[in-house]
Amino acid sequence: MPKADIHPTWYPEAKVICNGEVVMTVGSTQPEIHVEVWSGNHPFYTGTQKMIDTEGRVDRFLRKYGMIDKNKKKNQASDAKEK
């Protein structure tokens, strides 16, 4: 005999919300799904070039803990002046 009440609740009309606006409904185990980017505003699907400002995890870690090599930046600047 299978166990009773072990499956999550299924919401056939779950709302997908982007920027406070309901963009679509899908079936899900959550009643609301909040997203930052979806196919309606993604640059690939809309054909627009939009820069999404993200930085790599390593860069963010190095900047956070002050491990960025400052000499490297100075060397790059002096190399650019020589050219």
Swiss-Prot record:
Residues annotated as coiled-coil are none
Q: Name one GO biological process term.
A: translation
Q: Name one Pfam family in it.
A: Ribosomal_L31
Keyword RNA-binding attributed: yes
- Residue ranges spanning the membrane: these are none
The GO molecular function terms of this record are: rRNA binding; structural constituent of ribosome
Which Gene3D superfamilies does this one have?
Ribosomal protein L31
Question: Taxonomically, which superkingdom?
Answer: Bacteria
Q: Under the cellular component aspect of Gene Ontology, which terms does the record hold?
A: ribonucleoprotein complex; ribosome
Keywords of the record, alphabetical order, are: Ribonucleoprotein, Ribosomal protein, RNA-binding, rRNA-binding
| Entry keyword annotation includes rRNA-binding | yes
Functionally, this protein is described as follows: Binds the 23S rRNA.
In which family does this protein belong, per the annotation? Belongs to the bacterial ribosomal protein bL31 family. Type A subfamily.
Q: How would you summarize the oligomeric state and partners of this protein?
A: Part of the 50S ribosomal subunit.
Its name, as the record gives it, is: Large ribosomal subunit protein bL31
Say which species the protein is native to.
Answer: Gloeothece citriformis (strain PCC 7424) (Cyanothece sp. (strain PCC 7424))
